[in-house]
């Protein structure tokens, strides 16, 4: 009796077996004469598939680059981080949001440094937003503030988008103009 090696894609798990067995689903064998098949590699989240597996070859994976991600295993492609989100390392499964008071409205980015502070008189109170909003009349904010704050007692501002409040007019003797405060000069 002449023994022959099992071809690639098949194996024999017993010495002197009369026949070879096919590799099962999710397995491969690229070499002849083997006693088992190998399991296909799983591309983890943060990586993408660059070569699909078959009975004679394994799945090949590649890391997503910084500023990109894949949330699922065996992803066909990496996705670009959405505007006002970022990640700074390769092989990431998600992106982080720009924090409140900072935005990056149009471009995905690979660094939190690209999340820029809201200008004076504007704010953004939620993470991951793409634009800052002007403070309403009677409210002000410093650059990068996540929220606008109300003008203090005896101060006002009647215009939106301001960084400081105006003092109420002094009527003499320490008295202030009646009705002055918030958004009204009185």
Regions found by a protein language model. Name each.
Residues 1-186:
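Disulfide-rich, cysteine-dense extracellular ectodomains and adjacent flexible linkers of secreted
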């Amino acid at each position: 009796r002449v023994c022959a090696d099992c071809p690639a894609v098949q194996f024999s798990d017993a010495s002197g077996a009369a026949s070879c067995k096919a590799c099962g689903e999710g397995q491969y064998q690229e070499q002849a004469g083997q006693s088992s098949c190998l399991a296909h590699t799983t591309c983890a989240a943060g990586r993408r598939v660059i070569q699909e597996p078959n009975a004679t070859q394994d799945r090949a994976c590649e890391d997503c680059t910084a500023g990109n991600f894949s949330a699922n295993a065996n992803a066909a492609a990496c996705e670009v981080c959405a505007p006002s989100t970022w990640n700074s390392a390769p092989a990431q499964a998600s992106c982080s949001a720009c924090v409140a008071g900072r935005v990056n409205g149009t471009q995905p980015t690979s660094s939190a440094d690209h999340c820029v502070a809201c200008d004076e008189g504007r704010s953004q109170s939620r993470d991951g937003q793409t634009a800052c909003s002007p403070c309403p009349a009677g409210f002000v904010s410093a650059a990068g503030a996540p929220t606008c704050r109300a003008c203090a007692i005896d101060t006002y501002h009647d215009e939106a988008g301001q960084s400081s409040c105006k003092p109420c007019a002094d009527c003499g003797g320490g008295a202030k103009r009646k009705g002055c405060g918030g958004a009204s000069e009185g």
